[in-house]
């Protein structure tokens, strides 16, 4: 009788997590996309208004700086406010654990059951998570509020990323007017570079999300581009109404 052989299943290659940047990808995508789209619309508007290349360049530089500062300040305040709300909620949760411990223990049992912990395992798991107030607080922080300390966003990092990436995105619409005197040619260059930039941002996102590069790039280009077209059209309609 020949020996029975078993083939081991194909090994899935181990892929590292992206690390501490993952909670800031919102700021990365928003900052650079906003810089790409909003600055192109600004440049298109002033070119349509008849400004020469030097005036367009000056307007673009001023708009890029103002937009970056506004984006950075807004993101700092928004992130800090969200973190303050969360801190206040966790302080209240600590008070609940001290004064209404039985209710919190019952709540964590309900959450464990909802997660699929079997009845015969529930007592062991619940006792492990409730044997100490600090352990219970950490468990409630993760299960009730969905918070892990390592994933909390720094307002300063969010501010810097949003502001700098907005500034970086705006360069695609500003730099062409450093090298050309014809505003129409400059605008065409700005539009082309912006489109490439939007597609590139989507492709970079696909590397992180491990999704299809072309689909992600096209999605970012189409959605951001459509938003830009809508904004331009609304502005044009308002302008027609005023004249």
Q: For each of these PLM feature ranges, what is it?
A:
Residues 2-78:
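Internal alpha-helical transmembrane segments
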Residues 2-20, 24-26, 80-163:
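Cytosol/matrix-facing amphipathic helices and coiled-coil assembly/linker segments
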Residues 28, 56-61, 159-163, 187-192, ...:
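Hydrophobic alpha-helical transmembrane segments
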Residues 35-40, 162-173:
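Core segments of transmembrane alpha-helices
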Residues 77-91, 204-218:
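Juxtamembrane helix-loop transition segments at the membrane interface in multi-pass membrane proteins
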Residues 172, 192-211:
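Transmembrane alpha-helical segments of integral membrane proteins
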Residues 219-232:
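Small-residue-rich segments of transmembrane alpha-helices in multi-pass membrane proteins
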Residues 232-243:
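Juxtamembrane boundary at the C-terminal end of a transmembrane helix
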